[in-house]
Amino acid sequence: FDNKILSEIMKTQVLFLSKEGIVDTSFIGLDSTPVSANTSQNNPKSFLSNKFKPGNQPRADSDCRLGVHTASNQTNEKKYEFYWGYKNHVLVDCISGLPIYEMTTTAEVHDATVALDILAATHSFQPITDCIFLADKGYDVKNIYNQVKELYNGECIIPLNKRNTKNPKLLPQGNPICEAGLAMWKDGKFSDCGRTRQKFCCPLKSSKDTLCPCHHKNFYNGKKHRGCTRYLTIPDDLRLSIDRDSKYFKSNYSLRTECERYNSRFKNTG
């Protein structure tokens, strides 16, 4: 069946649902699911040693390609499996759980390489301006953060893939530790000389009874808000400037489960 016809039908349905207020692009999530080719080389009961050799193209499907399906993108699990086939990339409205756009590629195509094409194609008929884009760490690529911000004034909620980070020690993970060994609290941001700085304050500054463990002079200055203050410059890199430990990040990222639910329903349809 002609894929263009199916795509037009889906586009018409999305526009109708949007008009009815059922589909929205405020929170959109992208994920892919493997689609195995109908070939004996994908049979788990087959013990041929060369069935996943790149040059051993299945005769039953000359278009499929060799891909790798990881067990999870949520953790650092090493479990994965090879397969011959395709990938179905689906952009989902994470509020209604309904699909907005679909693209099928061969299995070797990396998820992140088609993300911007999918967003652009969606935006051409259903605007995604001011969206919050949710994806797993397979999409943790600097260009995606920048393009979502620049083209759509959007925001990315994507976990950090440490394999893409040259120096994890420079990341804004955790709060600075004061001289007393306590984790300091965030106390707002401000811009200064073209840079954004995060302010941190003493966690005991408002306490009336607690004493500073190291008896720091700043804690006994007689002021209402006492204790030490520190400032850290937030990186200009959008990817590294996200506080992934914040409630804001975690609550928004939890909406991405709608992508997994959709993929589960897709697989159950056969």
Where are these regions (language model features)?
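Short gly/pro/ser/thr-enriched loop/turn and capping motifs at secondary-structure boundaries
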Residues: 162-167
